[in-house]
A protein has these predicted regions:
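Alpha/beta enzyme core
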Residues: 39-52, 58, 63-87, 97-244, ...
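Charged, compositionally biased N-terminal leader segments and the immediate start
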Residues: 1-53
Length: 300
């Protein structure tokens, strides 16, 4: 019992170093002010080209097959020939059973293979299954792993259970980047988003990510603001730079520019790099291309 209390106290002590008592209304007001004052200046071709290079080009459909994922990857292979003046996406994101297909099809340098894992999207399975799935994805070629926190554990106060799962999966990933999805729409409050951000970083996350895209609401500017504040404070206390990835519900170019603006204003120019900033999306690539080229493009 004493050991459990000390473990619980360890996580409470980590949270106590940060302000986790946030007002949702205050966050909404700050975000609205930031969008009004700062977003217009970032609506430039240069920013849009940069945002394209931050995309984790994603296909996470129940209808995905070896053939469809192969075609999806071939589009990335063809991109440089079709758009020689633009840089390619950051990564291709697929279910773990398709890692080998992407690895065997992908021919371009600099595009990573990201796989969702750990019982995505609900995270409701045995830790042994999560470990095995993650290890198999990496063995098949995944460079990056995207997992979901055990939301039920967090909401019931089992911080230890939530954090130990992340730590165990990071041990499996080793040098491969681990992106930890908070599923912010299920957390209901800015305070919970702040707490899960801190606990995830404390447990070994290389990135924190808003959403799976399988639950509504998905990414929101308010969630992004809280997460970026947490990343900034964590960096100030530890010297460790953690990446940020909004995902799900990024339906317009302006949505992407809003997330860019939040990162720029809260974290600074250092984070404006696709090693620390990603966008998880299936539709944004064509929208950005269309905006940059001034005509409708449906390349992907």
């Amino acid at each position: 019992m004493e050991e459990n209390n000390s473990l619980s106290n360890k996580y409470d002590a980590a949270l106590a170093k940060y302000n986790t008592h946030l007002s949702d209304a205050d966050i909404q007001a700050r975000v609205a002010d930031l969008i009004e004052k700062k977003v217009p200046e970032n609506n430039t071709e240069e920013v849009k080209k940069f945002l394209f290079t931050c995309i984790d080009l994603t296909t996470l459909n129940s209808t995905d097959s070896d053939e469809s994922v192969m075609r999806f990857t071939e589009k990335v292979n063809q991109f440089d020939d079709e758009f020689p003046d633009l840089k390619n996406v950051a990564a291709i994101c697929v279910y773990p059973n398709f890692a080998a297909i992407v690895k065997n099809t992908l021919e371009v340098d600099g595009v990573n293979i990201a796989c969702v894992s750990g019982g995505f999207p609900s995270s409701q399975t045995f830790i042994e299954v999560k470990v095995a799935e993650t290890a198999l994805a990496i063995a098949d070629g995944a460079d990056e792993i995207d997992i979901v926190i055990s939301i039920g554990k967090f909401l019931s106060g089992d911080y230890e259970g939530m954090c130990e799962e992340i730590q165990e999966l990071k041990e499996v990933c080793k040098e491969h980047h681990l992106k930890v999805i908070l599923e912010t729409g299920a957390l209901k409050s800015a305070s919970n988003i702040k707490k899960t951000s801190i606990l995830s970083m404390y447990s070994g996350a290389d990135f924190i990510k808003t959403s799976t895209g399988k639950q509504q609401p998905a990414a929101t500017p308010e969630a992004a603001y809280v997460m970026c504040e947490a990343i900034k404070e964590y960096y100030q206390k530890t010297g460790n730079k953690i990446g940020f990835k909004p995902a799900g519900g990024i339906n317009t170019v302006n949505d992407a520019i809003i997330y860019y603006t939040i990162v720029k204003e809260l974290l600074g120019e250092e984070w404006l790099d696709n090693q620390l900033f990603r966008l998880g999306t299936s539709r944004l690539a064509n929208l950005l291309l269309s905006d940059i080229k001034g005509e409708e493009i449906k390349f992907f």
